Amino acid sequence: INFIATILKLRRPGLKLMQLPMYCWAMLGTSILVVLSTPVLAGTLILLSFDIVAHTGFFNPSLGGNVIVYQHLFWFYSHPAVYIMVLPAFGLVSEILPIHSRKPLFGYTTMVFSIMGIVVLGLVVWAHHMFTSGTPPWMRLFFTIATAFIAVPTGIKFFNWVATLWGGKISLNAAMLFSCGFIINFVLGGITGVALAQVPFDVHVHDTYFVVAHFHYIVYGGSVFVIFSSIYHWFPKFTGKMLNENLGRFHFIITFIGFNLCFAPQHWLGLNGMPRSCLLYTSPSPRDGLLSR
């Protein structure tokens, strides 16, 4: 609420909304998601606590409750939580790329509207996590379409980032390398996300390592790479001291290669039916998951 109030009401005189840095827009969108989705999770946990401690029947089928209701409430928060983690990274990348490509950010207005589009659509796609939970056909159709549409504002942002780099005087320092690594990883994660939005494919790979790979390409390949990029970009501004660029480039190389060696094979494992969240497997193959290990 403080972020929203500050951005909307406490700007300096003469600073219009469409003149804000992209990171401010990203934090505005993130804050809206937090305000709208987190109370649902809090209420759900309170009801679940009553079920456990006081033996009420909100979600207990033997007492007249419904487990599917719990899933809806849980995912109503937990899918926007992904965007809560990723939207600030979008804002940071939008600040870093223009500096190290020595060009203004391409398509500022469309970047703003794409953030708000992600916020709106991010609140109406939660049930794509529940395609195997007995959801009716009309619900599957709606959430498939809504999930596919969220690729549109996300794609706009990526095209604008590439257009920002195009023709620029790019400095391949550690901050830029990690930002470019983020773009590559997040595009791959986004492609698998569109695939998971399709009901037949999702039913096939649900609860397999394909989902693990998709999640990590979004969260680690997205947010964590941008955290590293931001450290290399702002550390000199915070401290007045430069970090070693050779070590930074080496950090990027081993992180990028190691990350992809770990999680890219998991797509293949999931397509072949390897379930996640299992400690032991009945017929382990020495080849399965060798690189992931």
Q: Where are the model-predicted features located?
A:
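Structural signature of hydrophobic alpha-helical transmembrane segments
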Residues: 82-83, 143-148
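Conserved small/polar residues in nucleotide/adenosyl-binding loops
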Residues: 281-288
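Hydrophobic alpha-helical transmembrane segments of polytopic
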Residues: 26, 30-33, 87, 114-118, ...
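Transmembrane alpha-helix entry/boundary detector in multi-pass membrane proteins
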Residues: 77, 206-221
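Generic alpha-helical transmembrane segments
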Residues: 150-152, 220-228
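Hydrophobic alpha-helical membrane-insertion segments
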Residues: 29-45, 185-186, 252-264
